[in-house]
From Swiss-Prot:
Sequence positions that bind UDP-alpha-D-glucose: S277, W346, A347, H364, W367, N368, S369, E372, Y386, E388, Q389
Single GO molecular function: UDP-glycosyltransferase activity
Binding of UDP, residues: S277, W346, A347, H364, N368, S369, E372, Y386
Name of protein: UDP-glycosyltransferase 72B1
InterPro entries on file: UDP_glucos_trans, UDP_glycos_trans_CS
Result after altering H19A: Loss of activity
Database matches in PROSITE patterns: UDPGT (PS00375)
Keywords: Detoxification, Glycosyltransferase, Transferase
Enzyme class per UniProt: transferase
Catalytic activity, reaction form: hydroquinone + UDP-alpha-D-glucose = hydroquinone O-beta-D-glucopyranoside + UDP + H(+)
EC number: 2.4.1.-, 2.4.1.218
Length: 480
């Protein structure tokens, strides 16, 4: 069979578009640079979403997809946290994954590697049964990866809740992080989400390598520390920034309208405001943000979602039913119509960030969004909401110094005065100049590392060569 001569890699993304998108970029590089074939094995608790299908259907023919039957999570309560749901989806998909691997064997296409992402380590069981080397694609920072690798030890040595720690956690090469800023599933050690986080991190040592979506100039000290050989520490390969910077088609007139509006604004004058496809604010915080943007007197393009009490409430359903514009303060649209453009739900983000009129990005610090900003050289206002975003915000504002971070009051609310101060500071102030210059440097570095002789390209080549060597070995042993 002709195809069996080409190394074949199976990739299992955790549920959620934020996990799929960087893996798609990773797969494209494997195909374009190394001539590999890739199969995405998609697990989920329902039928594939339209967004998933659109992304997967647009890929080159050497990247195919298999959709596993939905898993049954009806035994979980409505309060079950997202990390538990994601982990259980992968774990309960193992019987179906075995069938897919059987079909690979029958077709002479046994993968030379299985790649999972951060919560998918239970799929290693299937990889081991079929003698396929397991790898992890880690879609966030080297700093958070260091935390994941250290968590089993931390769990044994700390008895209190991490938020009660009086000293910040100091990991080699990493920015010090207070316990209250640890990622969400580490905030309640009695919750199943923490147990699943711990369960997955304990299995990281079983991987034959970890590919991380970052690059040396962005996190030099953390990457150096991770690459020092150590017990229970697989080799780490920084292969980022893997982001989709190709042209997204603005699907509706409203979406292309926002780009037309940007065309008419002065160079670098617009603050782009978006909390990602999963992030929402409370009613009160939405109100304060709106009034702060108005008071700042800066130009802005705001992707708005209806408020809710849960920061990641639209993680699986990015179009809540209510019109978000009805939640804006009275008179806000009229007051800001000359300077602001408000768009519900979604904007073509890569195009907005690459637009010459965009000069800043108020972001939830999701890592995909952060890397898109780095690639376009756009300085940040860090406004973390959920997952590991607080850890990212600390890294971006205190270590990399590519972001300003507004201060919240004791009640967790960022007041309008603080919003206005930070927005003005980024777009007009001295502080803004510093982060702008830093982002310019990082943009150039991001471009360099992905060139043919760049560090991230070389790191990916090392892994691809390993996989090709494994394929040759299998052929010599007469095993397809």
């Amino acid at each position: 069979m002709e195809e069996s001569k080409t190394p074949h890699v199976a990739i299992i993304p955790s549920p959620g578009m934020g996990h799929l998108i960087p893996l798609v970029e990773f797969a494209k590089r494997l195909v374009h640079l190394h001539g590999l074939t890739v199969t995405f094995v998609i697990a989920g608790e329902g039928p594939p979403s339209k967004a998933q299908r659109t992304v997967l259907d647009s890929l080159p023919s050497s990247i195919s997809s298999v959709f596993l039957p939905p898993v049954d999570l009806t035994d979980l309560s409505s309060s079950t946290r997202i990390e538990s749901r994601i982990s259980l989806t992968v774990t309960r998909s193992n019987p179906e994954l075995r069938k897919v691997f059987d079909s690979f064997v029958e077709g002479g296409r046994l993968p030379t590697a299985l790649v999972v992402d951060l919560f998918g380590t239970d799929a290693f069981d299937v990889a081991v049964e079929f003698h396929v080397p397991p790898y992890i694609f880690y879609p966030t920072t080297a700093n958070v990866l260091s935390f994941f690798l250290h968590l089993p030890k931390l769990d044994e040595t700390v008895s209190c809740e991490f938020r009660e720690l009086t000293e910040p956690l100091m990991l080699p090469g990493c920015v010090p992080v207070a316990g209250k800023d640890f990622l969400d599933p580490a905030q309640d050690r009695k919750d199943d989400a923490y147990k699943w986080l711990l369960h997955n991190t304990k299995r990281y040592k079983e991987a034959e390598g970890i590919l991380v979506n970052t690059f040396f100039e962005l996190e030099p000290n953390a990457i150096k520390a991770l690459q020092e050989p150590g017990l229970d520490k697989p080799p780490v390969y920084p292969v980022g920034p893997l982001v989709n910077i190709g042209k997204q088609e603005a699907k509706q007139t409203e979406e292309s309208e926002c780009l037309k509006w940007l065309d008419n604004q002065p160079l670098g004058s617009v603050l782009y405001v978006s909390f990602g496809s999963g992030g929402t604010l409370t009613c009160e915080q939405l109100n304060e943000l709106a009034l702060g943007l108005a008071d700042s007197e800066q130009r802005f393009l705001w992707v708005i979602r209806s408020p809710s009490g849960i920061a990641n409430s639209s993680y699986f359903d990015s179009h809540s039913q209510t019109d978000p514009l009805t939640f804006l303060p009275p008179g806000f649209l009229e007051r800001t119509k000359k300077r602001g453009f408000v768009i519900p739900f979604w904007a073509p983000q890569a195009q907005v960030l690459a637009h010459p009129s965009t000069g800043g990005f108020l972001t939830h610090c999701g890592w995909n969004s952060t890397l898109e900003s780095v690639v376009s050289g756009i300085p940040l206002i860090a406004w973390p909401l959920y997952a590991e975003q607080k850890m990212n915000a600390v890294l971006l504002s205190e270590d990399i110094r590519a972001a300003l971070r507004p201060r919240a009051g004791d009640d967790g609310l960022v007041r309008r005065e603080e919003v206005a101060r930070v927005v003005k500071g980024l777009m007009e102030g001295e502080e803004g100049k510093g982060v702008r210059n830093k982002m310019k440097e990082l943009k150039e570095a991001a471009c360099r590392v992905l060139k043919d002789d760049g560090t991230s390209t070389k790191a990916l080549s090392l892994v691809a060569l390993k996989w090709k060597a494994h394929k040759k070995e299998l052929e010599q042993n007469g095993n397809h």
